[in-house]
Curated annotation (Swiss-Prot):
The keyword Ribonucleoprotein does not apply. One of its GO terms (molecular function) is indole-3-glycerol-phosphate synthase activity. The keyword Membrane does not apply. Gene3D superfamilies: Aldolase class I. This is Indole-3-glycerol phosphate synthase. It comes from Bordetella avium (strain 197N). Keywords: Amino-acid biosynthesis, Aromatic amino acid biosynthesis, Decarboxylase, Lyase, Tryptophan biosynthesis. It catalyses: 1-(2-carboxyphenylamino)-1-deoxy-D-ribulose 5-phosphate + H(+) = (1S,2R)-1-C-(indol-3-yl)glycerol 3-phosphate + CO2 + H2O. Pathway: Amino-acid biosynthesis; L-tryptophan biosynthesis; L-tryptophan from chorismate: step 4/5.
Length: 262
């Protein structure tokens, strides 16, 4: 595991330990189970694709470790409503505080501002974080193969599915893909950004495509900046996209989404 990812995960472990002291997992689980409002994340992507349109997961993030602050004028509710008005299938909201300047409140506010399903984008390593995600309103969680063992991945996926949530599993190379293909979720994210070097290559997705069986919905992540990038992926059968930076840097995120997929 690379240094940046290891550092983030160490912070996450501390965050979970602190959160558990403030609120028990049993209490949090009761709150999560009491919510009967899951929005179908994978289904929303499929519905958009069935209309002949790309399934865009539009991301809400203020900053990143590699790029710094992406958007000074940041209002999660406003951005979410703009995305929904311009054809996004789903939202992705960063909830990491230390590295991405995100928050749980951003997710709550984004979800309240529109009818779209929401992914909690964070570095998840403990069931507590998944239960917390559902309690705050998330409909889907991200599991990163580079950060977890195969056993952890299966166990965390089961926790999410028991709560009615979808799971987006993220890979970057062939070895990680082989692990991910053993999971139940149909949502397979391919991150074009190398978490070790932060270099971004769209070929990462294209090179892994031949190894992916039918029944998996590929979501290409990172480096989708221009309409040409979307068209390239669609020509190769990739119909789902997770895009953040290109939208966050634009004056009007929703309008940039519409331009990207036009």
């Amino acid at each position: 595991m690379n240094d940046i990812l290891a550092k983030i995960l160490a912070v996450k472990a501390e965050e979970v330990a602190t959160a558990r002291q403030m609120r028990s997992e049993a209490e949090l689980l009761r709150e999560a189970q009491a919510r009967q409002d899951v929005r179908g994340f994978a289904q929303a992507i499929e519905d958009k694709i069935a209309q002949g349109k790309p399934g865009v997961i539009a991301e809400i993030k203020k900053a990143s470790p590699s790029k710094g602050v992406l958007r000074e004028n940041f209002d999660a509710s406003e951005i979410a409503a703009s995305y929904a008005a311009h054809g996004a299938a789903c939202l992705s909201v960063l909830t990491d505080v230390q590295f991405f300047q995100g928050s749980h409140d951003n997710l709550r506010r984004a979800r309240a501002a529109c009818p779209l399903p929401v992914l909690r984008k964070d570095f998840i390593l403990d069931p507590y974080q998944i239960i917390s995600a559902r309690a705050m309103g998330a409909d889907c969680v991200l599991l990163i193969v580079a950060a977890l063992s195969p056993t952890q991945l299966r166990d965390l996926e089961a926790v999410a599915m028991d709560l009615g949530m979808d799971v987006l599993v993220e890979v970057h190379d062939e070895a990680e893909l082989d692990v991910a293909l053993g999971m139940k979720t149909p949502l397979l994210g391919i991150n074009n950004r190398n978490l070790r070097s932060f270099e971004t290559r769209l070929e990462t997705t294209l090179n892994l495509l031949p190894r992916i069986p039918a029944g998996k919905r590929v979501v290409t992540e990172s480096g989708i900046l221009q309409p040409d990038d979307v068209q390239l992926m669609r020509r190769h059968g990739v119909q789902a996209f997770l895009v953040g930076e290109a939208f966050m840097r634009a004056e009007e995120p929703g309008a940039e989404l519409a331009r990207l997929v036009a």
